[in-house]
Design a protein with these regions (language model features):
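Selective transmembrane helix interface/packing segments
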Residues: 1-169
Length: 169
C-alpha cells in the first residue's frame, strides 16, 4: 500500500467531537473505498519491479485483499442497520447507550479477521511468509521505496484499529 490511501482514510475518522478532517455522510463507504483502492498499489508495485516473482507476489496479495474486502463490508451491515447511517459521527453517537461490540459480536470478530488479512499480518501474510522464496511484491524494492511500502502497511494497520474502535466501541 502506498501512504496516501491510508492517510486519506484517516480523513473521515472522528477522533473526538468535532476533531476530524472532514465529516461526510458516507464516511463508512469512503473508508471501504480507500481500502479497496489499495489493491492497485499492490498490483502496480509488483508490476513495476519488472520481476516475475514480484508480479506473482503482487497478484497473490491483490487476490487476498479483494477476497477479504467482501467480508469486511458484510461485517458492517449490522452496524449500519443499528445506527441508521453511513456517517461515522452518527455511528459513534448511536453507541452512547451501549457499544455495538456487545450486540454485533460476530461482526466485530469478522471485521478484526478481515482487517488483519487486509494489513498482511500473521497468519495472513502468505505472499511474504517465511516459507516463500521471495518477499512478495516488494522483492526488488530497497531503501526509501521499501520504507514507503512498509509505512503504508503500518498506516493501514492503524486505520483498521481506529475503525474497530469507532465502529464497535
Amino acid at each position: 500500500q502506498t501512504c496516501a490511501l491510508p492517510m486519506m482514510g484517516f480523513a473521515v475518522v472522528p477522533f473526538a467531537p468535532g476533531m476530524m478532517i472532514i465529516d461526510v455522510n458516507i464516511g463508512l463507504l469512503f473508508f471501504l473505498g480507500m481500502t479497496s483502492l489499495a489493491v492497485y498499489s499492490v498490483l502496480l508495485g509488483g508490476l513495476a519491479s519488472n520481476n516475475k516473482y514480484a508480479l506473482l507476489g503482487g497478484l497473490r496479495s491483490a487476490a487476498q485483499m479483494v477476497s477479504y474486502e467482501v467480508f469486511m463490508g458484510l461485517s458492517l451491515i449490522g452496524v449500519v442497520m443499528m445506527s441508521g447511517s453511513f456517517s461515522l459521527v452518527d455511528i459513534v453517537e448511536a453507541q452512547t447507550d451501549v457499544w455495538f461490540c456487545f450486540s454485533q459480536i460476530l461482526g466485530l470478530i469478522v471485521f478484526i479477521i478481515a482487517g488483519i488479512a487486509e494489513s498482511h499480518r500473521l497468519p495472513f501474510d502468505l505472499p511474504e511468509a517465511e516459507h516463500e522464496l521471495t518477499a512478495g511484491f516488494h522483492t526488488e524494492y530497497g531503501g526509501m521505496k521499501f520504507a514507503m511500502f512498509m509505512l503504508g502497511e503500518y498506516l493501514g494497520l492503524m486505520l483498521i484499529s481506529c475503525m474497530i474502535v469507532t465502529l464497535f466501541f
